[in-house]
């Protein structure tokens, strides 16, 4: 399965969903508001409903989309 990320830095402030692979090989998923994007590190930062800031490495993303 090829990666498909439909989220861009222009989506800041919108609700997003990511499925991604962690550096240790495990899979993870996060849903929340896209707070920032670090271009140098190719990393998205998503604020969850638990008010936790989740780092999402761009190169590990399997699927990303904007949700309602």
What positions do the PLM features span?
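Conserved RNA-binding domains used in RNP assembly and mRNA/RNA metabolism
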Residues: 1-68
